Amino acid sequence: MKTKSLYLAVALGMMLGFSSCNLDTFPSDELNSDLLLQDAKGAEYIMDGCYAVLKDEVDFLGYASGNCYVRHYFQLSEFPGDNICLSAHTTDPLYEATAYMMTDGLKNVGTLWMVAYKVIYMTNTVIETLDESKPENKQLLGEAYFMRGLMHLHLATLYALPYSFGRDNLGVPLRTSTASEVTVRNPVGEVYDQIVADLRKAADFMGKSRGNAGYPCKEAALGVLSRVYLYMEKYDDCIAAVEEALNGAAPDSKLEPTATFPQYFANAKTSKETLFCIAHETSDDRGQSSTGSMYLKDGIGWGEIYPSDPLMYLYERHPEDVRMSFILPQFSGKPGKKVYVTIPASDSDPEAPHIKYVTSLIDDGGGNYSFKGSDGNTYAIEKRMVNGEAQPDPAGPYFEYHANYMGEDCLVRINNDVTLRTGYTIPMIFISKFSYQDGNPMLSSPVMCRWGEVLLNAAEAYARNGNDAKALEYVNAIRTRAGIPTYTAGDLQGYANVINVVMDERRLELAWEGHRFFDMCRNKLPMDRRYAGAQPYKIVDPTKEQHIVYPIPNNEWTVSGIQQNPGY
């Protein structure tokens, strides 16, 4: 234990002690093969340090509070999308990610870059030290290749354009050795090719994990590899990776059962569904600096991030959907229905917070709804078709409510009375996917890859290859677990095609897990953010919005001279 502590201290001290460094000046002699070879378990201790640093608060330019890689990763990967509502302005740098107001000096932008490359350096040390011809080294080498591939993937998806925008676009610097070298931004295609090679080698080297899901395994490497192939539009390869991971097992056999799925994220590190997570222990509770604090209050959290209205409409097509157990509306208990009308932002200030007008519902008993506006006039509520079909209540899965309110087309929601955030007119609807491990509202082991995603990777790949039957088979495994009706080729329940079915199922199943923003960008699909909140009231077109990629951190590009991303 004393030896392990020494190695962890060296590893973490090395990674975190250079908060102002850039890739050119990072010292390559702090931890080397000679040090590793002093102890047979040296590589194991170093890999444990790689996992630990992803959850620890780290110093970046003198600031450590709330500065966790995993927290920042979910801010940067999830908050620019259309699944979240930012309930108000905040001083947390999550605001800039949500509002497309990123700068190269933000701590989340700089910390994630710094920590990712420190982890990559550590994995390179292990890879250069261990003899891969020795069977006893295979597992740890596989872990090192896995983490190197995963870190490069995180960097490539955040700081470079999607692969689907072109292989020759500027990617991120590739680091495949500990040798000092001039920093250049490799093309996107080269970066993805290296990620594939690393994950393939990881899958070949690893077997079962060394412990809980906080340690990667063969299936974790194949799962992330299927994601990478999907992003690269290599659909046959994506399918092959998923089928290799399944190894003949039925897709639904890999999922957490319906009965226990509401507790899945609280128990992620021991669930059979989790392929890799950032494992946390009780001692890792970060309180208000935790990932969960962004989504939940429960006495301690900030609870500033709520589900978006369009996503709520999608869930509410099937109120029995077990996935709604992760959504916690703060009902007031007052009788009667309320109308929540989104007031569009003004053309002169689209960045200003856009709010809801909240009032009581008027129901004439004949299925006609209306409300009284702040001007004293009564406004009719229109049921608008979605996916080509409007259905009557209570089934009603394919409609939204709208109203022409004071000359504006406004999205309307009807619900029981929900407590509003203090000082604002945004209903408080918390999210619990990052909470309640060991009963602690601020503790979880955030999931990086799970079978639910992997099956939907295969579903999308099959659909894009024209194999609708197989695509629906995988989608239906997810929907059956959710406890909601499945699809057939003859009944897509209002959808025009199976691709749209898959994309909405990905949105429902993987909400707030860091996938939706990437899914929309790689497919060049618009994100409609015209709903209440502090995020800009606009449609984000990934083909036109430069800020779908983050800036290269200031302390990197100003020293190494690598090219900054456009728009910064």
Regions found by a protein language model. Give the residues of each.
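Membrane-proximal, proline-rich intrinsically disordered regions
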Residues: 21-73, 486, 530-568
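Long, intrinsically disordered, low-complexity segments
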Residues: 279-281, 287-293, 300-302, 441, ...
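Conserved, well-structured interaction surfaces
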Residues: 87-158, 186-190, 203-208, 345, ...
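Short, surface-exposed recognition loops and adjoining beta-strand edges that mediate ligand/DNA contacts
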Residues: 33-34, 62-81, 162-168, 212-292, ...
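Hydrophobic-face positions in mid-chain alpha helices that act as interaction patches
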Residues: 239-446, 451, 499, 549-552, ...
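Bacterial Sec-dependent N-terminal signal peptides
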Residues: 1-29
